[in-house]
Design a protein with these regions (language model features):
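FIC/Doc superfamily catalytic core
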Residues: 1-128
Length: 128
């Protein structure tokens, strides 16, 4: 699982490298912590044990939680990709991922749909 300080570091590096407004949204560090607890709750209480599902839950919790002043979608996506990489699953960062994250943040794509997307991209990358 990704810890609070690691997620904040990911966000800060994104802001440093790509620009944007630094800092936390209204709930401060507690907002980030709450988003991470949502992921942990899905794992522990809902029995979520699929790598793609957990990664997608990170993306959704951070992007929809608007826990930072800026770069929530980028941070959510990077956390999802990082989680998968830590589990030995590396998927290419395709151009449509950023558009997909807009739909994730707006509620147009569920965590289940995002997990299916991650799985499909990974499976395609394995056949190359």
């Amino acid at each position: 699982m990704l810890d609070l300080d690691y997620v904040i570091t990911i966000h800060d590096e994104i802001i440093r490298d790509l620009g944007g407004l630094s800092g936390f949204a209204h709930a401060g560090r507690g907002g980030v912590e709450a988003a991470l607890h949502r992921v942990e709750n899905h794992v522990h209480y809902a029995g979520l044990d699929d790598v793609f599902g957990i990664a997608a839950t990170y993306a959704v919790a951070i992007a929809r939680g608007h826990v930072f002043n800026d770069a929530n979608k980028r941070t959510g996506l990077t956390c999802a990709l990082t989680y998968m990489e830590r589990q030995g699953i590396s998927i290419p960062r395709l151009a449509d991922l950023e558009d997909l994250m807009v739909d994730v943040a707006d509620g147009g794509v569920t965590s289940e749909e995002l997990a299916e997307y991650f799985s499909a991209v990974w499976e395609m990358s394995q056949s190359d």
